[in-house]
Amino acid sequence: MILVLSQDPDFFKKLSKTQTPPLLWIGCSDSRVPANEIIGAAPGEVFVHRNIANMVIHSDMNMLSVLDYSVNILKVKHIIVCGHYGCGGVKAAMGNSSVGIIDNWIRHIKDSYKFRKKEIEEISNEKERFDKFVEWNIKQQVLNLAVTSIVQQAWANGQELSIHGWVYGLDTGLVKDLDVTFRTHDDIRNSSVYKLGFN
């Protein structure tokens, strides 16, 4: 921030007047996955919502409030759902042990895991199996986001809004685009995520 102030002494005064971020980031609470640092964004460039395992749950009023504000007030053009390899929430959902109150939160992932269990268990390498389910969870959350009434209404109104699924490698610092992007109602119907039964 010292460098920023040396280049623009009024940076924070300008920043305090308004925010016009072009994107909403929905990511994991993991302290090693900070949105701004991962994408090289400055303060004011990203609206952020984080929770364990980057979940989009239709009864989560916190997430829905963030989504509504970012889409309808800030008019973001992109929403990125970014999970990460090695996600503890996803790993807990794949197991049988109780981890406390979080069991209620990861129930949604656990249900998805049961649905895909046969396919997942065909992957013999444990790390590859875990990584694949992390990716599937992100795709599920992208679909969950795309079918919210907030996003559906924005598209119906002709608002430019794209939803993307990314995964971050803790051990590499690299982001992988999972090639799941929705821009319209038709994108949902035509997507392999929807056809795989992630709905």
State each model region's role.
Residues I26-C28, R50, I80-H84, H164-G169:
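Short beta-strand segments
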Residues P43-N54:
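Glycine/charged-rich beta-loop-alpha catalytic/anionic-binding loops adjacent to active sites
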Residues V4-E45:
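N-terminal short beta-loop-beta anion/metal-coordinating cradle
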Residues D30-R32, H84-G89:
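Gly/Ser/Thr-rich loops at beta-strand to alpha-helix junctions
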Residues M1-P21, A53-K77, G88-N199:
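Divalent-metal-activated hydrolytic enzyme cores
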